[in-house]
């Protein structure tokens, strides 16, 4: 509808993008590796992205809520092996675009939570394709509506 095209639900939009990106690592293949090594590498790529996104989201909170200075943030991020130049880039980004990283991380987390809930609820009847179809059929919307709608679609 025209009104929905004007409303933004960044958590859904960016969360779905992040969810899809992280899910895509399930299809990542490596030459000359056995199945177990491939699975471990897929998980490593996924975990690395989650860690990077989490650190960026925490940086946003520390700068915009806890009033971290550039020096504070550099010191904090250095504990994770992040160079001063990279910390400066993150600092400048979160100052100019507060809460942006949070829409990615919290949006992804909410979708991951919803998937886990549906998997637990449906057990062996859970179908990942049906879950993805249910999420996408809702379109960009607040998570309260998404959770209700996906639950209804998946349990029909």
Question: What label would you give each PLM region?
Answer:
Residues 1-156:
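N-terminal maturation segment of proteins
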């Amino acid at each position: 509808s025209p009104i929905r095209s004007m409303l933004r639900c960044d958590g859904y939009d960016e969360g779905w993008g992040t969810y899809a990106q992280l899910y895509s690592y399930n299809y990542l293949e490596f030459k000359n590796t056995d199945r177990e090594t491939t699975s471990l590498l897929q998980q490593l790529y996924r975990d690395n992205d989650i860690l990077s996104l989490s650190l960026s989201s925490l940086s946003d909170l520390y700068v915009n809520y806890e009033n971290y200075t550039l020096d504070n943030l550099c010191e904090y991020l250095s504990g994770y092996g992040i160079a001063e130049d990279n910390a400066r880039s993150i600092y400048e980004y979160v100052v100019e675009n507060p809460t942006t990283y949070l829409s990615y991380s919290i949006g992804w987390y909410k979708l991951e939570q919803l998937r886990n809930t549906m998997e637990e609820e449906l057990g062996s009847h859970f179908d990942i394709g049906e879950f993805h179809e249910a999420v996408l059929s809702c379109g960009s919307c607040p998570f309260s509506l998404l959770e209700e709608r996906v639950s209804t679609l998946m349990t029909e």
